[in-house]
């Protein structure tokens, strides 16, 4: 049984979120939560929320035992980018790109 959870339009760049996602792929959920809890990265907080949601979905919807769950898949896709303007000297302007991510976590009991 596979259960998934998503966080769409997360306000972090996919490159930074993938660094965190790669650390927990394939681990038991207890070990993954331990790593995410003590990680100093902002993306770790976002990924931890998705992992917690996936665990809750497995518990509530499928009646799964938490001790048997592991992270089957975790991937971070690129969301839409927000374009902003930063005023500069002499009437010029620079474009600022604020990236978003779609974080998906799949837990399974196998």
From Swiss-Prot:
One of its GO terms (molecular function) is structural constituent of ribosome. Part of the 50S ribosomal subunit. GO terms for biological process: translation. Belongs to the universal ribosomal protein uL22 family. PROSITE patterns: RIBOSOMAL_L22. Keywords: Ribonucleoprotein, Ribosomal protein, RNA-binding, rRNA-binding. InterPro entries: Ribosomal_uL22, Ribosomal_uL22_bac/chlpt-type, Ribosomal_uL22_bac/org-type, Ribosomal_uL22_CS, Ribosomal_uL22_sf. It comes from the Bacteria. The keyword Repressor does not apply. The lineage of its organism: Bacteria, Pseudomonadati, Pseudomonadota, Gammaproteobacteria, Alteromonadales. Disulfide bonds: none annotated. NCBIfam families: rplV_bact (TIGR01044). This protein binds specifically to 23S rRNA; its binding is stimulated by other ribosomal proteins, e.g. L4, L17, and L20. It is important during the early stages of 50S assembly. It makes multiple contacts with different domains of the 23S rRNA in the assembled 50S subunit and ribosome. The keyword RNA-binding applies. This is Large ribosomal subunit protein uL22. It comes from Shewanella amazonensis (strain ATCC BAA-1098 / SB2B).
């Amino acid at each position: 049984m596979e259960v998934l959870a998503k966080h769409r339009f997360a306000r972090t760049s996919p490159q930074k979120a993938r660094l965190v996602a790669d650390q927990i792929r394939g681990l038991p959920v207890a070990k993954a939560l331990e790593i995410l809890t003590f990680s100093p990265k902002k993306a770790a907080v976002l990924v931890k929320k998705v992992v917690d949601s996936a665990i809750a979905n497995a518990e509530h919807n499928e009646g799964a035992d938490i001790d048997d769950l592991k992270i089957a898949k975790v991937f971070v896709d690129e969301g839409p980018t927000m374009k902003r303007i930063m005023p500069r000297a002499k009437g010029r302007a620079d474009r600022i790109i604020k990236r978003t991510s779609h974080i998906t976590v799949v837990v399974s009991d196998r």
